[in-house]
Amino acid sequence: MALHDARPPFAAIGGTVPPEFSALPTPCYLLDENALRRNAEILGGLAQRTGCRVLLAQKAFSNYDLYPLLAPHLAGTEASGLFEARLGAEEMPGEVHVFCAAYRADEMDELLRYADHIVFNSPAQLAKFGAKVKAAGKSVGLRINPECSTQDGHAIYDPCAPGSRLGTTRAAWDA
């Protein structure tokens, strides 16, 4: 049975809206905690079976009231900058990984208080901050742009599109 076959359908899709919904202010977000828990359990099982570490991408989901529900199944959080790193460190147990297209020198000391792993976008950023990050006992990464796009028609969203500034290319690495 496919995973999507096991999920109950949402009543409002092709059905009726539950009466409780009419009392809610709009717009608002509705979250199904049971579905969220099931998905977290699936991710936790994946981590156990493969040895990988699954992180919560806070850019996509930063509802920290639900972090306690997710925490038993995830290794930590991923952040795109200082404020998300702080949120992850304060609200979710586990690792905090940070990737940012460019880091600010005036934020690096504070970022190092929260981050466990920092990924740089270019050899220049790695050269500028790498030694300081390592001296603070944090692990370091460099985002690589493989320059091999897997999609057509959406170059603006494609990190491997020609001209993308996300990750270092072979030419930039060799320079």
Sequence positions of predicted segments:
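Acidic, low-complexity proline/glycine-rich segments
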Residues: 1-17
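Generic N-terminal amphipathic, Lys/Arg-enriched alpha-helix
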Residues: 12-29
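A short alpha-helix capping/helix-coil boundary motif
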Residues: 20-24, 44-47, 62-66, 155-156
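Active-site-proximal beta-alpha core segment in soluble small-molecule metabolic enzymes
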Residues: 52-175
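A non-catalytic, amphipathic alpha-helix used as a structural packing/dimerization or gating element
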Residues: 34-42
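N-terminal glycine-rich anion-binding loops that anchor highly charged ligand groups
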Residues: 12-16, 41-42, 48, 53-61
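A glycine-/small-polar-enriched, mobile loop at the entrance of the PLP active site in fold-type I
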Residues: 24-33, 52-58
